[in-house]
Curated annotation (Swiss-Prot):
Sites where the protein binds Mg(2+): D9, E63
GO BP: fatty acid biosynthetic process
Record's protein name: Holo-[acyl-carrier-protein] synthase
Signal peptide, first to last residue: none
UniProt keywords, alphabetically: Cytoplasm, Fatty acid biosynthesis, Fatty acid metabolism, Lipid biosynthesis, Lipid metabolism, Magnesium, Metal-binding, Transferase
Gene3D superfamilies to which the protein is assigned, alphabetical: 4'-phosphopantetheinyl transferase domain (3.90.470.20)
Keyword ATP-binding attached: no
UniProt KW Disulfide bond keyword: no
Organism: Burkholderia cenocepacia (strain HI2424)
UniProt cross-references to Pfam families, sorted A to Z: ACPS (PF01648)
GO cellular component terms listed in the entry, alphabetical order: cytoplasm
EC number: 2.7.8.7
């Protein structure tokens, strides 16, 4: 495997909460995929703070993923096309659907994700990898040197 790209993002939980309140919950429906949305509602029913933290981590993970694949939030990367779910052990993993899944498969791209949150912030880091046999990875950018 070769690294295709890396991405990181940090989200301020209070800003996510404010957007959620201002939109009457539509923000969660816009950003979360169907499986994420079910988890969000279940967590929010038990604890408003945990529900908002979950939404913030998923928002952050999508932003980090979009950076790792080099597209930002542009087709085929859409909010609902990527979900960050958890194995029973708690380890997060990403699941792509639709045109994003096709785009990733055509390039042999897989990804590893980690998310973390505290009271004020949620942070995510994504490493996108591709098969070493493919030419999908973007060329590395040489580091410039300044003369002293």
């Amino acid at each position: 495997m070769a690294i295709y790209g890396i991405g990181t993002d940090i989200a301020q939980v209070s800003r996510v909460a404010a957007v959620l309140e201002r939109t009457g919950g539509r923000f969660a429906e816009k950003v979360l995929g169907p499986d994420e949305l079910r988890v969000f509602h279940a967590r929010r029913a038990r604890s408003e703070a945990r529900g908002i933290a979950f939404l913030a981590t998923r928002f952050s993970a999508k932003e980090a993923f979009s950076k790792a694949i080099g597209l930002g939030m542009h087709w085929p990367m859409t909010w609902r096309a990527l979900q960050t779910l958890n194995h029973p052990s708690g380890e997060p993993y990403v699941v792509a659907s639709g045109e994003l899944a096709d785009w990733l498969a055509a390039r042999g791209i897989t990804a590893r994700v980690t998310v973390s949150d505290e009271r004020d912030y949620a942070v995510s880091f994504v490493v996108a990898e591709t098969d070493a046999e493919t030419d999908a990875a973007p060329a590395p950018v040489p580091v410039s040197r300044t003369s002293s």
